[in-house]
Amino acid sequence: APAQGTMNYDTSLACWAITAPTQLLSYHELLFIKAEALCRLNKTSEAESVLREAIIAGFINTEITLKSAIYDWGISGSADLSEKVANDYFDNSVKALFDANPLKETMIQKYLAFFGASGESLEAYNDYRRLKAMGESFIELSNPNNKSKFPLRYTYGSSDVLSNQNVKEAFGDGQYVYSENVWWAGGSR
């Protein structure tokens, strides 16, 4: 059974970048928003150009994050996510998928770019829920431990539940996160 604790499971190097900046609105997020808007307006040639810029900016941001983690923890290694690498990725992995479905590929690339320590994982989750509510299930998430359950809302942290009896009494064992929407999506809590 899964064990509660902070150091029980493997963690990506990107999540250990303790000195990497936390961004409220990053340049690559702005570009991804612009690319999505252009896709929705059927301006695909403009959207493609902006998506390429967004991916390049996202790669640079991830490179900064990884270099921070490498430095912070004294790990020997390097990270090359340069503009050339990003362009090669776009040309060889993204372009054909974008041509087939511009909006879907834009949203998938945005989701991938938000991984890491820059504070954008929550935005990726918001996009996931927004797209699902709009009937656009471009991003498929799965829970390998329970294929029918995926959180509909953000949970209380384990320290909040363990140290505050009021939270435990009000919310029980936390299973409501799989069945109840947040208040702005029709939930009651």
Spans of features found by a protein language model:
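Acidic/polar-rich alpha-helix caps and helix-coil junctions
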Residues: 1-189
